[in-house]
C-alpha cells in the first residue's frame, strides 16, 4: 500500500488503484453520516476534490491522489457511510481509478513512512 499526506491509501493492482482514507483519518473525522462519490469514467487530475464526506464533526473533501480515470465506485459506503469508520482499509474503500502515470507512486509514503508522518 501507498499513503498520501492527505491520509489516503492506495492499493495497486496493475494500473488500478483502490483508494480510501486511513484509519487515522477516519478516527479524526468521527462517525461518517454522508458520502458523495465521483461518477464512474470521470477523468480526474491530481488534487481534484472528488469525494465529499460529512461526519458528526465536520465536512471534508477527498482529493484525487493522481491523474487518471475513475473506473469503479463503492456504492456500499453511500448507503452505509459507517463502513468507512468500521473498516477504512477494507470494505470502506471509496473508488478505484486507473492511474495515468504510475511514477506518482514513488512520491507517496510506504506504511512505515506514513506511521512516522502521523506520530
Task: Place the predicted regions along the sequence by residue.
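Acidic, low-complexity mobile loops and tails
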Residues: 1-49, 82, 86-119
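A short, compositionally biased micro-patch
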Residues: 4, 12, 55-56, 65
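Residue-level recognition of beta-strand microenvironments
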Residues: 10-12, 56, 73-76, 102
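Structural motif
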Residues: 16, 67-69
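Short, solvent-exposed beta-edge and connector elements
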Residues: 28-34, 56, 64-67
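Short, Lys/Arg- and Gly-enriched loop/turn segments at beta-strand edges
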Residues: 54-63, 80-82
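Short, charge-rich, low-complexity interaction segments located
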Residues: 70-86
Amino acid at each position: 500500500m501507498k499513503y498520501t499526506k492527505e491520509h489516503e491509501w492506495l492499493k495497486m493492482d496493475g494500473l488500478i488503484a483502490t483508494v480510501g482514507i486511513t484509519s487515522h483519518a477516519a478516527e479524526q473525522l468521527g462517525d461518517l453520516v454522508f458520502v458523495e462519490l465521483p461518477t464512474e469514467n470521470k477523468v480526474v487530475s491530481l488534487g481534484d476534490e472528488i469525494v465529499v464526506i460529512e461526519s458528526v464533526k465536520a465536512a471534508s473533501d477527498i482529493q484525487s491522489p493522481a491523474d487518471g480515470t475513475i473506473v469503479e465506485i463503492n456504492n456500499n459506503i453511500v448507503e452505509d457511510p459507517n463502513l468507512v469508520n468500521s473498516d477504512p482499509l477494507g470494505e470502506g474503500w471509496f473508488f478505484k481509478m486507473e492511474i495515468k502515470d504510475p511514477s506518482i507512486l514513488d512520491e507517496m509514503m510506504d506504511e512505515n513512512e506514513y506511521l512516522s508522518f502521523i506520530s
